[in-house]
Amino acid sequence: LIRQNVKTLAAAVREGREIVVPGPTCSYMLKQEYPWLDGSDDARLVASHTRDLFEYLMRLHADGKLDTNFSKRPGKVAYHLPCHLKAQNLGTKSADLLRLIPGSEVEVIERCSGVDGTWGLKKEYYKISLKVAEPLFKDVPAARPDRVASDCPLAALQIAQGTGAAPRHPIQIVADAYGVTPE
């Protein structure tokens, strides 16, 4: 599967495309693991043209190409920084973009969700994963947010289970701020 993905994605890069990925674990895999697992020049090409979604959007902003005409305000957002974004040394690009929305206040929460890939979802580790995530479960409601966000869907699931909040991907909050409604 890796070789087929690399072949397909490398062809897209050669056509002038960038690979933009909304999931931090997936972008980490393409950037860091594919070159190591596949070892080919194509895998390195794919890695060098892969961007996390908010890494890409903030680059557009830096180049003056991102529309920042937001029509709705998200209020206070408790933003969970996923471990696979930290591992990519990207900083807090999602939080940075959310802060561009007028009237937003973003509190970054750097706590472990206890999921660790799918480890924390396995029956034998689930209770341990919840224990690991207890500091996160305390920090989210303590932030008194209007909204909760995480780029990582598994971390969002864990946050929902541990806090009762309904985390959303930051791009959903950005879409709301643009006034884009789901169909």
Model-predicted regions and their roles:
Residues 1-183:
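Iron-sulfur cluster-binding electron-transfer modules in prokaryotic oxidoreductases
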